[in-house]
A protein has these predicted regions:
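Mobile amphipathic helical/loop "lid" adjacent to a hydrophobic cofactor/ligand pocket
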Residues: 1-103
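A residue-level signal for conserved active-site and pocket-lining positions in enzyme catalytic cores
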Residues: 64, 82, 133, 208, ...
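Helical element adjacent to the flavin cofactor pocket in flavoenzyme catalytic cores
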Residues: 101-161
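Short, well-ordered alpha-helix to beta-strand connector turns
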Residues: 137, 168-169, 295-296
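A structural signal for the hydrophobic beta-strands that form the central parallel beta-sheet
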Residues: 141-143, 173, 300
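Mid-domain catalytic core of redox enzymes
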Residues: 148-277
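FAD-binding beta-loop-beta segment adjacent to the flavin cofactor pocket
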Residues: 246-247, 261-300, 304-307
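A conserved FAD-binding loop/helix module that cradles the flavin
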Residues: 301-325
Length: 325
């Protein structure tokens, strides 16, 4: 898993893919700007490993100011990295809790300069494991059945969709918090308040073959490629050939919030995704969530219960299963 940062208007780009791109192929290596980036990375990694209790309540922007991190570190590494991870604009990332980010960086080996964990991908992507679940279970699936609302009738939960009412003993919500709030009854005020601890933001994604959003120097092409025109838009391009080990000759990319910059003749598909916006530490959100788990025989899980990734969704689903066993 490699990462590049590109500021075309400043003619500045770099990639942390390997020592070759960091040192030998990096024309900015001997610049003061790049030196400040490296010093900032070493300093942040050191402080993250200390992981003091006093960091917990600080917003990340306040933390970086408190410890006098350079603007170069923030602009050309840290905020682009976080913005890319959560597909959120930098002004929202600045309000993330320090402890939340530090825990994530530690768990994913991002505080190690060397010997970072080797990321692996599932062949055919998430389709593969969803199919596996379907094939191995005797669960009935109702596709394209939008749930409009639910009704609580004594010890039964009535699910209302477009065509009919269905009665169940238990209900597990495994979707986004904003969707859950729309489905819950109006008098579920406590549940809706707790679910509001995590918001969602819609992002545009585009599958295409346009190389213009990639770093100018091909040595800097990485799995994740952040590009900024000094605005607050979070633009990221995934190099799918490198990420998923595609063997085809043509390069394929998925870009976030960049539709207007992509050559229309090279667009394959446009998609809209929703990504979580975290306002609190994970531990606080989970503690509050415990207050409503099981009320009215309703349970909640999803990637938003962790850091917003597939593995977080799996862990939260396992936790809900333990409630029911």
């Amino acid at each position: 898993m490699s990462f590049s940062v590109n500021y075309p208007n400043e003619n500045f780009e770099w990639s942390g893919k390997n020592l070759n791109t960091i040192i030998f192929k990096n024309k900015n290596f001997f610049s003061i700007k790049f030196l400040k980036i490296i010093i900032g990375i070493i300093k942040f990694n050191f402080l993250a490993k200390i992981n003091k209790q006093s960091f917990i309540k600080l917003k990340i922007d306040d933390f970086l100011k408190k410890f006098n991190f350079s603007k170069e570190f923030k602009k050309y590494y840290f905020y682009p990295m976080c913005s890319s991870i959560w597909s959120n604009p930098i002004d929202k990332i600045k309000n993330y809790k320090t402890y939340f980010l530090i825990k994530f960086f530690i768990n994913h080996g991002l505080v190690n300069l060397l010997f970072r964990p080797q990321w692996k991908v599932i062949k055919l992507g998430s389709y593969k494991y969803i199919k596996k679940i379907i094939d191995l279970s005797d669960i009935k699936f109702f596709l394209n059945n939008t749930v409009k609302s639910i009704i609580i009738n004594k010890d039964k939960i009535i699910i209302k969709n477009k065509n009919k009412l269905m009665n169940y003993d238990y209900l597990i919500f495994a979707n986004h918090t904003d969707e859950i709030k729309k489905i819950l009854p109006n008098n579920f005020k406590k549940q809706k308040k707790i679910l509001s601890l995590v918001d969602y933001k819609t992002n545009d994604a585009c599958l295409h073959t346009d190389t213009s959003l990639m770093p100018k120097n091909k040595y800097n092409w990485s799995s994740w490629n952040f590009i900024s025109f000094n605005d607050n838009v979070s633009r990221l391009t995934y190099w799918m050939n490198y990420l998923q080990n595609l063997t085809c000759k043509r390069n394929y990319f998925v870009s976030i919030n960049s539709n207007n910059l992509i050559n229309k003749n090279k667009i394959i598909k446009k998609i809209k995704y929703s990504h979580p916006v975290f306002k609190h530490n994970k531990e606080y959100t989970l503690k509050k969530l415990e207050e409503i788990q099981g009320l009215n025989n309703i349970y909640y899980c999803g990637a938003w219960c962790g850091y917003g990734f597939h593995e977080d969704g799996v862990v939260s689903a396992k936790n809900v299963s333990n409630y029911l066993l």
